[in-house]
C-alpha cells in the first residue's frame, strides 16, 4: 500500500537522522523492501553505518550493504534446510563484518527449530557458521565479539 510504504520511509528517514545526529549505528531489519532500504541507507550516508540484523537476503544485497559500511548479522535461519542462498552469504561476508544473533524468541536454529528461541542458542548459530566457514568455533566467537565491540563501542564497558 503506497501510503503505508511512504509512512515507513518517512519513519525510517527519521531514525537514520537520529543515528547521524547522535553518532550511533543503526540496527536495520528489512523484509520485502530491499531496493527502498538500500536507497535510504545510501542517501543517509551514515558515518557509523550499522548492522542489517536477522539478514535473510542474498549476496547481492549483502555486498551492497557491506559497500556502504554495514555489518551483516546472521540468525538461526542460516541453519534451515532451504537457506542455501543465505549460507552463500555466510561464506562470503568478510570475517571482520560478520555478527551472530538469535533473534529470540523466534527462528530457533536447528536442532531447536519449532521451539521458542533462546539467547543461549547463539552458540548453535556460531558453531554452525564456524563449520560452514572452515574455522574453529573459538576463532569465530572471538572475531564476532570483536566486531560487536567495534560496532557498539559502549559494549566494551559491560
Positions of the model-derived regions?
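Mid-to-C-terminal alpha-helical segments outside catalytic/metal-binding sites
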Residues: 121-158
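Non-cysteine beta-strand/loop elements that form the S-adenosyl-L-methionine
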Residues: 96-104
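Divalent metal-binding pocket/active-site signature
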Residues: 1-68, 88-89, 93, 111-120, ...
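Amphipathic alpha-helical segments at domain termini/boundaries
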Residues: 107-109
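Active-site glycine- and acidic-residue-rich loops that bind
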Residues: 72-88
